Amino acid sequence: MTDAIFRGMTRAELDRQYDQRTLVPRMALLFDDWRRRSDIFASRRGLPHRISYGRHQLQGFDLFEVPNPQGLHIHYHGGAWKALESHHAWWVAEPWLNAGHCFASIDFRLVPTVPLAEQVGDARLALAKAQELMASSMSLTVSGHSSGAHLAAMAVLAPEEGQLPPDCDHLILASGIYDLEPVRLSGRNDYLRLDHHDAVALSPKARLEGTL
């Protein structure tokens, strides 16, 4: 397809923009390194506690604790919404634990096993469950990487209907996707299966702009 479909870009150009392998062709080696770094970290620090927030095995998170914590840091892993798991991000915990914060690495059901809307729902449920473990004096920091940054933003900015936004002190989003409309028009939609309404409803950008 050679016609421009989004801000002057063709489908092929969008596909290149949303395929990390165009810049990092050996992605599998990077993922393996994350697991290796996580295993090395856990061998020194000890394994985390597994906390469930739902019935599915992926509706849970890995919690690293510290004595007398100052805060809780919650992290959502990347993986294009369809891959990886909480274990890949254990190594991210080290500086937070050293600073006196507990660290929760979140799992969630993956696309296309569930639609993206349900994955976002998992992200919200996990955040709510993790907050139940906090003392009122603890600070809350939330982060996410890549597609996990999208989930982190949605969990913080767009709670379930009737719920108040979490009292989040800091939101750290790395290389995230905040407007899903160009994603919908790219090859990613072969497994995301979003329509225009979905793309708007599940976009943090729309929440911030007040278009919902």
Language-model features: locations:
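N-terminal cap/lid segment of alpha/beta-hydrolase-fold proteins
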Residues: 17-67
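Hydrophobic/aromatic beta-strand patches that form the interior of the parallel beta-sheet core
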Residues: 51, 74, 104, 141, ...
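Short, surface-exposed "cap/lid" segments of acyl-processing enzymes
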Residues: 66-96
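Catalytic metal-binding/acid-base residues of hydrolase active sites
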Residues: 80, 109, 177-178
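Catalytic nucleophile-loop/oxyanion-hole region of alpha/beta-hydrolase
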Residues: 84-93, 104-141
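Primarily recognizes the serine-hydrolase "nucleophile elbow" in alpha/beta-hydrolase
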Residues: 125-188
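The feature captures the conserved acid-bearing segment of alpha/beta-hydrolase catalytic domains
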Residues: 170, 176-183, 196-212
